[in-house]
Protein backbone atom coordinates (compact mmCIF):
# COMPACT_ATOMS: atom_id res chain seq x y z
CA UNK A 1 0.00 0.00 0.00
CA UNK A 2 1.33 3.46 -0.88
CA UNK A 3 -0.98 5.47 1.35
CA UNK A 4 1.25 5.12 4.39
CA UNK A 5 4.21 6.48 2.41
CA UNK A 6 2.61 9.47 0.71
CA UNK A 7 3.13 12.83 2.31
CA UNK A 8 0.08 14.14 0.47
CA UNK A 9 -2.23 11.24 1.30
CA UNK A 10 -5.28 12.80 2.94
CA UNK A 11 -5.38 10.08 5.59
CA UNK A 12 -1.88 8.97 6.56
CA UNK A 13 -1.42 6.67 9.57
CA UNK A 14 2.32 7.33 9.82
CA UNK A 15 1.66 10.90 10.93
CA UNK A 16 -0.64 10.09 13.86
CA UNK A 17 2.10 11.12 16.32
CA UNK A 18 1.39 14.70 15.26
CA UNK A 19 -2.28 14.50 16.25
CA UNK A 20 -1.48 16.70 19.25
CA UNK A 21 -0.35 19.48 16.90
CA UNK A 22 -3.40 18.90 14.69
CA UNK A 23 -5.71 19.40 17.65
CA UNK A 24 -3.87 22.57 18.64
CA UNK A 25 -4.39 24.22 15.25
CA UNK A 26 -7.97 23.08 14.66
CA UNK A 27 -10.55 25.88 14.81
CA UNK A 28 -12.92 25.70 17.77
CA UNK A 29 -15.66 28.07 16.56
CA UNK A 30 -17.53 28.63 13.29
CA UNK A 31 -16.04 32.14 13.07
CA UNK A 32 -12.58 30.55 12.77
CA UNK A 33 -13.72 27.93 10.25
CA UNK A 34 -12.29 28.92 6.85
CA UNK A 35 -13.97 28.04 3.57
CA UNK A 36 -17.10 25.91 3.08
CA UNK A 37 -19.18 29.11 3.22
CA UNK A 38 -22.45 27.35 2.36
CA UNK A 39 -21.96 24.83 5.16
CA UNK A 40 -20.90 27.45 7.70
CA UNK A 41 -23.85 29.71 6.90
CA UNK A 42 -26.40 26.92 7.20
CA UNK A 43 -24.93 25.51 10.40
CA UNK A 44 -24.98 28.93 12.07
CA UNK A 45 -28.75 29.09 11.49
CA UNK A 46 -29.45 25.48 12.53
CA UNK A 47 -27.39 25.83 15.73
CA UNK A 48 -28.99 29.14 16.74
CA UNK A 49 -32.47 27.74 16.07
CA UNK A 50 -31.79 24.68 18.25
CA UNK A 51 -30.43 26.90 21.03
CA UNK A 52 -33.48 29.18 20.87
CA UNK A 53 -35.77 26.16 21.25
CA UNK A 54 -33.48 24.70 23.93
CA UNK A 55 -33.40 21.33 22.18
CA UNK A 56 -30.87 19.00 20.62
CA UNK A 57 -29.61 19.81 17.14
CA UNK A 58 -31.10 17.56 14.47
CA UNK A 59 -28.98 14.57 13.44
CA UNK A 60 -26.21 15.64 11.06
CA UNK A 61 -24.47 13.73 8.26
CA UNK A 62 -21.20 15.18 6.95
CA UNK A 63 -19.65 13.66 3.83
CA UNK A 64 -16.88 14.44 1.40
CA UNK A 65 -13.29 13.46 0.51
CA UNK A 66 -10.77 12.73 3.29
CA UNK A 67 -9.03 15.58 5.06
CA UNK A 68 -11.60 18.33 4.50
CA UNK A 69 -12.55 18.83 8.14
CA UNK A 70 -15.47 16.53 8.96
CA UNK A 71 -14.17 15.77 12.46
CA UNK A 72 -13.26 19.43 12.96
CA UNK A 73 -16.79 20.51 12.03
CA UNK A 74 -18.31 17.97 14.43
CA UNK A 75 -16.23 19.36 17.30
CA UNK A 76 -17.10 22.93 16.33
CA UNK A 77 -20.82 22.05 16.47
CA UNK A 78 -20.33 20.64 19.98
CA UNK A 79 -18.48 23.79 21.09
CA UNK A 80 -21.10 26.10 19.60
CA UNK A 81 -23.92 24.11 21.22
CA UNK A 82 -22.06 24.01 24.53
CA UNK A 83 -22.46 20.24 24.91
CA UNK A 84 -20.24 17.19 25.32
CA UNK A 85 -19.16 15.11 22.33
CA UNK A 86 -18.31 11.42 22.39
CA UNK A 87 -16.30 10.14 19.45
CA UNK A 88 -16.13 6.67 17.93
CA UNK A 89 -15.99 5.07 14.48
CA UNK A 90 -18.00 2.54 12.51
CA UNK A 91 -15.45 -0.32 12.59
CA UNK A 92 -15.07 -0.01 16.39
CA UNK A 93 -18.78 -0.62 17.03
CA UNK A 94 -18.75 -4.36 16.40
CA UNK A 95 -21.72 -5.32 18.60
CA UNK A 96 -25.05 -3.71 19.44
CA UNK A 97 -23.92 -3.57 23.06
CA UNK A 98 -20.98 -1.33 22.10
CA UNK A 99 -23.37 1.28 20.73
CA UNK A 100 -25.84 0.84 23.59
CA UNK A 101 -23.09 1.56 26.13
CA UNK A 102 -22.27 4.86 24.40
CA UNK A 103 -25.89 5.94 24.02
CA UNK A 104 -26.87 5.24 27.62
CA UNK A 105 -23.99 7.40 28.88
CA UNK A 106 -25.05 10.48 26.90
CA UNK A 107 -26.50 13.46 28.72
CA UNK A 108 -29.30 15.63 27.38
CA UNK A 109 -28.44 17.30 24.03
CA UNK A 110 -24.99 15.65 23.91
CA UNK A 111 -23.42 14.68 20.59
CA UNK A 112 -22.36 11.20 19.49
CA UNK A 113 -19.90 11.43 16.60
CA UNK A 114 -19.42 8.30 14.48
CA UNK A 115 -16.62 8.54 11.92
CA UNK A 116 -16.70 6.16 8.94
CA UNK A 117 -20.37 5.60 9.66
CA UNK A 118 -20.75 3.72 6.36
CA UNK A 119 -18.82 0.84 7.98
CA UNK A 120 -21.41 0.15 10.69
CA UNK A 121 -22.56 -3.46 10.82
CA UNK A 122 -26.25 -4.15 10.00
CA UNK A 123 -26.81 -5.34 13.58
CA UNK A 124 -25.55 -2.05 15.03
CA UNK A 125 -27.57 -0.05 12.50
CA UNK A 126 -30.77 -1.76 13.63
CA UNK A 127 -30.14 -0.52 17.16
CA UNK A 128 -29.43 2.99 15.89
CA UNK A 129 -32.75 3.47 14.05
CA UNK A 130 -35.10 3.74 17.09
CA UNK A 131 -32.42 5.65 18.99
CA UNK A 132 -32.29 8.32 16.29
CA UNK A 133 -36.02 8.45 15.67
CA UNK A 134 -37.64 7.92 19.08
CA UNK A 135 -34.71 8.28 21.51
CA UNK A 136 -35.23 4.69 22.58
CA UNK A 137 -33.09 1.56 22.72
CA UNK A 138 -34.63 -1.79 21.88
CA UNK A 139 -32.51 -4.42 23.62
CA UNK A 140 -33.01 -8.19 23.39
CA UNK A 141 -32.57 -10.03 26.69
CA UNK A 142 -32.03 -13.78 26.78
CA UNK A 143 -31.99 -16.31 23.96
CA UNK A 144 -34.40 -18.59 22.16
CA UNK A 145 -38.02 -18.85 23.38
CA UNK A 146 -37.14 -16.97 26.57
CA UNK A 147 -35.83 -13.94 24.67
CA UNK A 148 -37.68 -10.70 25.23
CA UNK A 149 -37.29 -7.09 24.17
CA UNK A 150 -36.97 -4.22 26.60
CA UNK A 151 -37.08 -0.52 25.79
CA UNK A 152 -34.71 1.98 27.39
CA UNK A 153 -35.49 5.69 27.10
CA UNK A 154 -32.60 7.91 26.02
CA UNK A 155 -32.17 11.65 26.53
CA UNK A 156 -32.48 13.76 23.38
CA UNK A 157 -29.12 13.71 21.61
CA UNK A 158 -27.53 14.54 18.27
CA UNK A 159 -25.88 11.92 16.11
CA UNK A 160 -23.21 13.29 13.78
CA UNK A 161 -22.06 10.81 11.16
CA UNK A 162 -19.04 11.36 8.92
CA UNK A 163 -18.21 9.42 5.79
CA UNK A 164 -16.18 9.61 2.60
CA UNK A 165 -18.72 7.30 0.93
CA UNK A 166 -22.24 8.63 1.34
CA UNK A 167 -23.42 6.27 -1.38
CA UNK A 168 -22.47 3.29 0.79
CA UNK A 169 -24.95 4.28 3.51
CA UNK A 170 -28.18 2.32 3.59
CA UNK A 171 -31.27 4.34 2.70
CA UNK A 172 -32.95 3.84 6.12
CA UNK A 173 -29.89 5.27 7.87
CA UNK A 174 -29.33 8.12 5.44
CA UNK A 175 -33.00 9.17 5.60
CA UNK A 176 -32.85 9.59 9.38
CA UNK A 177 -30.43 12.50 9.18
CA UNK A 178 -32.28 15.81 9.28
CA UNK A 179 -29.22 17.80 8.15
CA UNK A 180 -26.88 16.65 5.38
CA UNK A 181 -23.74 18.63 4.55
CA UNK A 182 -21.24 17.94 1.79
CA UNK A 183 -17.72 19.35 2.15
CA UNK A 184 -16.01 20.40 -1.08
CA UNK A 185 -12.32 20.77 -1.91
CA UNK A 186 -11.04 24.14 -0.70
CA UNK A 187 -10.12 27.12 -2.83
CA UNK A 188 -6.46 28.16 -2.79
CA UNK A 189 -7.24 31.48 -1.07
CA UNK A 190 -9.11 29.67 1.73
CA UNK A 191 -6.24 27.24 2.16
CA UNK A 192 -3.82 30.16 2.32
CA UNK A 193 -5.78 31.56 5.30
CA UNK A 194 -5.74 28.12 6.93
CA UNK A 195 -1.97 27.75 6.45
CA UNK A 196 -1.33 31.25 7.80
CA UNK A 197 -3.56 30.62 10.83
CA UNK A 198 -1.79 27.31 11.52
CA UNK A 199 1.59 29.02 11.26
CA UNK A 200 0.45 31.64 13.77
CA UNK A 201 -0.80 28.90 16.14
CA UNK A 202 2.62 27.21 15.91
CA UNK A 203 4.46 30.54 16.38
CA UNK A 204 6.13 30.26 12.98
CA UNK A 205 7.52 33.16 10.98
CA UNK A 206 5.70 32.88 7.67
CA UNK A 207 5.26 35.33 4.81
CA UNK A 208 1.93 35.47 2.98
CA UNK A 209 3.60 34.33 -0.25
CA UNK A 210 5.05 31.34 1.60
CA UNK A 211 1.58 30.41 2.82
CA UNK A 212 0.28 30.78 -0.73
CA UNK A 213 2.97 28.43 -2.09
CA UNK A 214 2.00 25.73 0.43
CA UNK A 215 -1.71 26.25 -0.29
CA UNK A 216 -1.22 25.87 -4.05
CA UNK A 217 0.26 22.41 -3.61
CA UNK A 218 -2.11 21.10 -0.93
CA UNK A 219 -4.64 19.49 -3.30
CA UNK A 220 -7.51 21.56 -1.91
CA UNK A 221 -7.22 19.73 1.42
CA UNK A 222 -6.53 21.37 4.82
CA UNK A 223 -5.06 18.21 6.33
CA UNK A 224 -2.47 18.04 3.55
CA UNK A 225 -1.81 21.79 3.81
CA UNK A 226 -1.04 21.50 7.53
CA UNK A 227 1.15 18.44 6.97
CA UNK A 228 3.14 20.20 4.24
CA UNK A 229 3.47 23.24 6.50
CA UNK A 230 5.14 21.14 9.19
CA UNK A 231 7.65 19.71 6.72
CA UNK A 232 8.35 23.15 5.24
CA UNK A 233 8.92 24.37 8.80
CA UNK A 234 11.56 21.64 9.26
CA UNK A 235 13.31 22.69 6.05
CA UNK A 236 13.23 26.39 6.99
CA UNK A 237 14.69 25.73 10.43
CA UNK A 238 17.54 23.52 9.15
CA UNK A 239 18.39 25.14 5.82
CA UNK A 240 17.58 28.78 6.58
CA UNK A 241 16.78 31.14 9.45
CA UNK A 242 13.34 29.65 10.14
CA UNK A 243 11.39 32.24 8.17
CA UNK A 244 9.12 30.65 5.55
CA UNK A 245 9.21 32.72 2.37
CA UNK A 246 7.88 31.76 -1.04
CA UNK A 247 11.39 30.70 -2.11
CA UNK A 248 11.94 28.54 0.99
CA UNK A 249 8.50 26.93 0.61
CA UNK A 250 9.19 26.22 -3.07
CA UNK A 251 12.56 24.61 -2.33
CA UNK A 252 11.14 22.54 0.53
CA UNK A 253 8.19 21.28 -1.49
CA UNK A 254 10.41 20.44 -4.46
CA UNK A 255 12.63 18.47 -2.09
CA UNK A 256 9.49 16.62 -0.93
CA UNK A 257 8.74 15.82 -4.61
CA UNK A 258 5.44 17.72 -4.53
CA UNK A 259 5.14 19.67 -7.78
CA UNK A 260 3.32 22.91 -8.58
CA UNK A 261 0.03 21.06 -9.11
CA UNK A 262 0.30 19.16 -5.84
CA UNK A 263 1.17 15.91 -7.63
CA UNK A 264 3.59 13.51 -5.98
CA UNK A 265 5.61 10.62 -7.36
CA UNK A 266 2.66 8.20 -7.56
CA UNK A 267 0.39 10.71 -9.32
CA UNK A 268 3.04 11.32 -11.97
CA UNK A 269 3.83 7.62 -12.24
CA UNK A 270 0.19 6.79 -12.98
CA UNK A 271 -0.30 9.54 -15.55
CA UNK A 272 3.00 8.80 -17.30
CA UNK A 273 2.24 5.07 -17.41
CA UNK A 274 -1.04 5.70 -19.22
CA UNK A 275 0.61 8.15 -21.62
CA UNK A 276 3.77 6.20 -22.37
CA UNK A 277 2.64 2.57 -22.10
CA UNK A 278 -0.97 2.78 -23.23
CA UNK A 279 -0.93 5.75 -25.65
CA UNK A 280 -3.08 7.83 -23.33
CA UNK A 281 -5.80 5.21 -22.92
CA UNK A 282 -8.43 3.97 -22.67
CA UNK A 283 -6.88 1.36 -20.39
CA UNK A 284 -8.41 -0.85 -17.72
CA UNK A 285 -7.70 -0.47 -14.02
CA UNK A 286 -6.09 -3.92 -13.77
CA UNK A 287 -3.58 -3.03 -16.50
CA UNK A 288 -2.71 0.23 -14.75
CA UNK A 289 -2.27 -1.61 -11.44
CA UNK A 290 0.13 -4.07 -13.07
CA UNK A 291 2.04 -1.30 -14.87
CA UNK A 292 2.73 0.78 -11.75
CA UNK A 293 2.85 -2.09 -9.23
CA UNK A 294 -0.03 -0.90 -7.08
CA UNK A 295 -3.32 -2.38 -5.86
CA UNK A 296 -6.41 -1.38 -7.84
CA UNK A 297 -8.30 -0.30 -4.69
CA UNK A 298 -5.48 2.07 -3.77
CA UNK A 299 -5.47 3.53 -7.28
CA UNK A 300 -9.24 3.98 -7.24
CA UNK A 301 -9.59 5.38 -3.72
CA UNK A 302 -6.30 7.21 -3.12
CA UNK A 303 -4.61 8.29 -6.36
CA UNK A 304 -7.37 8.84 -8.90
CA UNK A 305 -9.89 11.15 -7.15
CA UNK A 306 -7.74 14.28 -7.18
CA UNK A 307 -6.49 13.65 -10.73
CA UNK A 308 -10.08 13.30 -11.92
CA UNK A 309 -11.26 16.31 -9.95
CA UNK A 310 -8.50 18.44 -11.51
CA UNK A 311 -9.29 17.22 -15.02
CA UNK A 312 -6.11 15.24 -15.71
CA UNK A 313 -7.75 11.82 -15.82
CA UNK A 314 -11.13 10.53 -16.96
CA UNK A 315 -13.03 7.37 -16.10
CA UNK A 316 -14.96 6.04 -19.08
CA UNK A 317 -16.84 2.77 -19.74
CA UNK A 318 -13.85 1.66 -21.85
CA UNK A 319 -11.22 2.52 -19.24
CA UNK A 320 -9.05 5.39 -18.01
CA UNK A 321 -8.02 8.20 -20.37
CA UNK A 322 -5.59 11.04 -19.68
CA UNK A 323 -6.67 14.50 -20.81
CA UNK A 324 -4.89 17.07 -22.98
CA UNK A 325 -4.10 18.91 -19.74
CA UNK A 326 -1.92 15.99 -18.61
CA UNK A 327 0.13 16.10 -21.83
CA UNK A 328 0.64 19.85 -21.40
CA UNK A 329 1.69 19.41 -17.77
CA UNK A 330 4.45 16.95 -18.70
CA UNK A 331 5.38 18.64 -21.99
CA UNK A 332 4.65 15.46 -23.96
CA UNK A 333 3.17 15.48 -27.46
CA UNK A 334 -0.19 13.78 -27.67
CA UNK A 335 -0.08 10.78 -30.05
CA UNK A 336 -2.22 10.83 -33.19
CA UNK A 337 -4.94 8.19 -33.15
Swiss-Prot record:
Subcellular location: Cytoplasm
Binding-site positions, Mg(2+): 71
EC number: 3.6.4.-
Biological processes annotated in GO: DNA recombination; DNA repair
UniProt keywords, alphabetically: ATP-binding, Cytoplasm, DNA damage, DNA recombination, DNA repair, DNA-binding, Hydrolase, Nucleotide-binding
Segments of this protein annotated with the region Large ATPase domain (RuvB-L): 4-186
Residues holding ATP: 25-26, 67, 70-72, 133-135, 176, 186, 223
GO molecular function: ATP binding; ATP hydrolysis activity; four-way junction DNA binding; four-way junction helicase activity
Keyword Transmembrane on entry: no
Function: The RuvA-RuvB-RuvC complex processes Holliday junction (HJ) DNA during genetic recombination and DNA repair, while the RuvA-RuvB complex plays an important role in the rescue of blocked DNA replication forks via replication fork reversal (RFR). RuvA specifically binds to HJ cruciform DNA, conferring on it an open structure. The RuvB hexamer acts as an ATP-dependent pump, pulling dsDNA into and through the RuvAB complex. RuvB forms 2 homohexamers on either side of HJ DNA bound by 1 or 2 RuvA tetramers; 4 subunits per hexamer contact DNA at a time.
Complex formation: Homohexamer. Forms an RuvA(8)-RuvB(12)-Holliday junction (HJ) complex. HJ DNA is sandwiched between 2 RuvA tetramers; dsDNA enters through RuvA and exits via RuvB. An RuvB hexamer assembles on each DNA strand where it exits the tetramer. Each RuvB hexamer is contacted by two RuvA subunits (via domain III) on 2 adjacent RuvB subunits; this complex drives branch migration. In the full resolvosome a probable DNA-RuvA(4)-RuvB(12)-RuvC(2) complex forms which resolves the HJ.
NCBIfam families from the UniProt entry: PRK00080.1, ruvB
Name of this chain's protein: Holliday junction branch migration complex subunit RuvB
Lineage of source species: Bacteria, Pseudomonadati, Pseudomonadota, Gammaproteobacteria, Vibrionales
